[in-house]
Amino acid sequence: MMTVRDPRFPSSSTTAIQSDAAIKFCDTTLRDGEQAPGVAFTAAEKLAIAAALDAIGVHQIEAGIPAMGVTERDVLREILATDPHADIVGWCRADHRDVEAAASCGLVTAHLTIPVSDLHLKSKLGRDRAWARLRVRDCVADATDRGMRVSVGFEDASRADDAFVTDLAGELRELGVTRLRWADTVGLLDPVSAHDRLGRLVRAVPGPWEIHAHDDFGLATANTIAAVQAGFTWVSTTVLGLGERAGNAPIEEVAMALRHLLKLPVDLDTTSFRSLARLVSRAARRPLPAGKAVVGESVFAHESGIHVHGILRHPATYEPFDPAEVGGRRRLAIGKHSGRASVRYALEQYG
C-alpha cells in the first residue's frame, strides 16, 4: 500500500439547508449500543468510551439505565465524577422507580420513554393511550419536581397514530419537557415518507425534536438525514451503529452526511472517528469491517487502474471527502486490477 497527499476537495452540488446552528448529537452507544446481543462493556470500557465521546464534542451522552442495578448506577456516578463537558443522561422508562434510580445517581438529566403505538401498549403492557398519557405526565412531573431536566421518547412512533403523538407532544411541551424523541423502533421508515411525516410533526409542534432511527432495513442514516431535512435538530446515534438487532444510525455516517451532503455545520472532532471506532469495536468484541462506511480500513484504498489514475490526478474523482477528516489516509494497492499508473507510481515511491 502507498499513500498519496490530499489536495483540496471540491464541494458537492447538494443544496445546503439554511441554518447556522449545528445539529446536536445524543450518542447512545453506552445504552442502546450495549443492548446489542453479546455486548457487555466493563466499567473501565464505559468510562473510556464516555471520555472519548466527550473529547470529540458529543453534546449529550446517554450513558446507561439507572434502574438496571447498583453496578450500572455506580458507573454512571463515575462518569459524572469526571466532570465531562457533555450532558450525561440516564435512560428511564416512564416509571417512578426509574426516576428515583436516576436521581439517586446525581443525574440532572433524565430521558423518559413511553410506548405510543397501540401494538406496544396493548400487546406488551396491556394498556391503552389514556394510560400512556397519564403515566408519562406523572413521571415528567416527578422528575421536574426533583430538579431534573427531562426529555421524552416516543417508543415505536413509526407505528403510532400521528394525531395521538402530536397531541401528546403538545401537552409535554407545555409541561416544560426539553426535547422530544421520535423513535423508529424497528426501522420501518423510508426517507421520503419520513421527510413528509416528520415535517408535519415539526410544524404542528415546534421545538427541539430528536430522531432515533434503527437500521433493520439499512436506512437508519438515510432516515436520520431526512428527519434533519424535515426540521429535527437532534440526532440519536451510536458508534459504528452498534445497537439492538441491526443497530442504530452510526455517528460517523450521520456526521459526515450532515457536513458534506446537507452542508450543515458539525461541531464534532471528526478526525478522531477512526480511533473512536477502534475503541468501541474492541470493547464490543466485534471486528471492524474493512468496508465500513467512513471508518473502515479499506474505504480510502484503491486498486483499480482507472480509479488510481483518477486519484493521482485529483483524489476527489473517486473520494467524497478528504480521508484526514475522519483520521484516515488514502492508500493505493498493487494487485490484479492495477494499471500502469499504479505501477509507475509505486516504482517512483520506491525509487
Swiss-Prot record:
Q: Which CDD domains match?
A: DRE_TIM_NifV
Q: Which UniProt keywords apply?
A: Nitrogen fixation, Transferase
Which domain of life, per UniProt?
A: Bacteria
Q: Which GO terms describe its molecular function?
A: homocitrate synthase activity
Q: EC number(s) in its UniProt entry?
A: 2.3.3.14
Family note: Belongs to the alpha-IPM synthase/homocitrate synthase family.
Job description of the protein = This protein is a Fe-Mo-cofactor biosynthetic component.
Q: What is this protein called?
A: Homocitrate synthase
Species name for this entry?
A: Frankia alni
